């Protein structure tokens, strides 16, 4: 039972979601040439770093978590794990994760993981989440790091492919997070967290959601146009983007914003999972000229 508490405080659901993303970035860069030890080190190392960030986030959020129905049962709120023990747990996970990334990948990969960690723990959790409606935007930078870390573990450089992944996953985070904020609106209001639906209302948030999905759609095409992914990926990217946009647009005449937001959230998981899988397997592209060049 005690082991389960230490597992739960690390938010295993978030870790699993990031595993899919980091694998997508890794396989995209590897293009069929997989080094098993590098893959394992990247996946395990980043998982430990993410787990560490989640534990420290739980420690920081103890005061606001007790006001939210979704989070008031967390072990850091109920006292099932002491603050001292949770902090030690988080720090050990972080040291192990960064140590493994430094030892088995490359300095750039470790630095990118460190940047994401700093943004999530230092900027988002400690400051922006509590004080600004732009906290979601700041947090999206850390949420977009896993696929970039996976990609750069192979490539060793931050190129256009890495930049495309950063844009795709940053832009995806916004509608995904806003959907959560809408169907959990009362929780955020009770905790005094100024997410966009609380600060400016659901109507304004719906506009932002549509605009971010349009930007996400454009960003997903960059991997194919730049020669990093193939036509299968392109087909899936267009399909999931259009379907996600269609769901977003139904929000303008929905009778129940919470039901609509849950649908939007659920499909966001489908969309990003589908893209991660496709970029993992559809790396066969035309040589050098790339699709964008072949159009002229």
Swiss-Prot record:
GO terms for cellular component: plasma membrane. This is Protoheme IX farnesyltransferase 2. One of its GO terms (biological process) is heme O biosynthetic process. Signal peptide: none annotated. The gene is cyoE2. PROSITE patterns: UBIA. It catalyses: heme b + (2E,6E)-farnesyl diphosphate + H2O = Fe(II)-heme o + diphosphate. Keywords: Cell inner membrane, Cell membrane, Heme biosynthesis, Membrane, Transferase, Transmembrane, Transmembrane helix.
């Amino acid at each position: 039972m005690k082991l389960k508490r230490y597992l739960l405080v690390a938010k295993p659901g978030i870790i699993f979601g990031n595993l899919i993303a980091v694998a997508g970035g890794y396989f995209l860069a590897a293009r069929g040439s997989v080094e098993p030890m590098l893959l394992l080190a990247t996946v395990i190392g980043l998982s430990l770093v993410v787990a560490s960030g989640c534990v420290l986030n739980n420690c920081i959020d103890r005061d606001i978590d007790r006001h939210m129905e979704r989070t008031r049962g967390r072990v850091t709120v109920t006292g099932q794990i002491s603050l001292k023990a949770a902090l030690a747990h988080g720090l050990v996970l972080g040291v192990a994760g960064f140590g493994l990334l430094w030892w088995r990948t490359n300095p750039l990969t470790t630095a990118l993981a460190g940047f994401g960690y700093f943004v999530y723990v230092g900027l988002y959790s400690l400051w922006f989440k509590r004080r600004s409606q732009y906290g979601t935007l700041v947090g999206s930078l850390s949420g977009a790091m896993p696929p970039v870390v996976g990609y750069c573990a192979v490539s060793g450089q931050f190129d256009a492919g890495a930049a495309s992944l950063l844009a795709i996953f940053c832009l995806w985070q916004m509608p995904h997070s806003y959907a959560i904020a809408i169907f959990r609106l009362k929780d955020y209001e009770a905790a005094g967290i100024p997410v966009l639906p609380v600060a400016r209302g659901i109507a304004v948030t719906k506009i932002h959601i549509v605009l971010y999905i349009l930007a996400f759609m454009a960003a997903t095409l960059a991997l194919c146009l730049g020669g990093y992914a193939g036509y299968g990926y392109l087909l899936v990217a267009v399909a999931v983007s259009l379907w996600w946009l269609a769901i977003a647009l139904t929000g303008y005449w929905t009778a129940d914003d919470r039901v609509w937001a849950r649908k939007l959230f659920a499909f966001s998981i489908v969309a990003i999972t589908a893209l991660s899988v496709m970029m993992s397997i559809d790396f066969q592209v035309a040589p050098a000229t790339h699709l964008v060049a072949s159009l002229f």
